[in-house]
């Protein structure tokens, strides 16, 4: 979706509810049974996946590509705003690379090590992830793991290729900063004007 995949809008809207509303060959009892992630230790890092898919033959994993940076941020925003549990690969928040190696468990320590200097080089991305973590803590509508949590997500809409939106009921027993959230994912290359729907509309 974030790197140009087509016809994934429905799947993205299903992912938002932790697949509780269907769309897969299974229906979890609650979104608490779902782990949301975009990279793991035994696959490509997110950064490497994006560099390979967006730049293919000319892939330079140490280069700061603006389109890869933007796609990384959108991927993080998407899974931080989905119901379910979050999982991050160590270093994802600063564009960790394993130089395109997808299964590095037998690779050298030099390839697998965390390159801490990237926390400075990609400091803006680190701050973005910190912001998402802080924001997530303020969103009971997305952190709800109950069997009824999916009912908090309404008005899921597809607005064209790479663009979806939905409303989140963010009310809680404790006062919340926002009672309702309107979330839009725009993976297209164009700015979009999206009307906020009426609740229940």
Where are these regions (language model features)?
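Short, glycine/charged-enriched secondary-structure capping and boundary segments
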Residues: 102-105, 197-199
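A broad, low-specificity signal for short, low-complexity segments enriched in glycine/proline
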Residues: 1, 51, 127, 141-145, ...
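Conserved alpha/beta catalytic core and glycan-binding cleft of carbohydrate-active enzymes
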Residues: 1-90, 94, 103-105, 170-176, ...
């Amino acid at each position: 979706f974030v790197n140009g995949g087509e016809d994934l809008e429905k799947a993205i809207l299903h992912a938002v509810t932790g697949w509780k509303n269907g769309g897969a060959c299974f229906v979890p009892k609650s979104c608490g049974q779902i782990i949301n992630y975009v990279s793991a230790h035994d696959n490509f890092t997110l950064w490497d996946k994006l560099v390979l898919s967006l730049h293919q033959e000319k892939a330079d994993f140490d280069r700061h590509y603006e389109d890869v940076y933007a796609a990384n941020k959108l991927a993080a925003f998407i899974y931080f705003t989905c119901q379910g549990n979050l999982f991050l690969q160590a270093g994802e928040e600063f564009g960790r690379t394993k130089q395109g190696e997808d299964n590095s468990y037998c690779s050298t320590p030099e390839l697998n090590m965390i390159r801490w200097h990237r926390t400075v080089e990609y400091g803006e991305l680190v701050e973005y992830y910190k912001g998402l973590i802080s924001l997530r803590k303020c969103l009971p509508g997305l952190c709800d793991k109950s069997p009824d949590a999916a009912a908090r997500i309404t008005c899921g809409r597809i607005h064209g290729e790479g663009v979806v939106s939905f409303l989140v009921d963010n009310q809680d027993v404790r006062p919340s900063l926002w009672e309702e959230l309107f979330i839009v994912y725009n993976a297209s290359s164009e700015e979009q004007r999206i009307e906020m729907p009426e609740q229940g509309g």
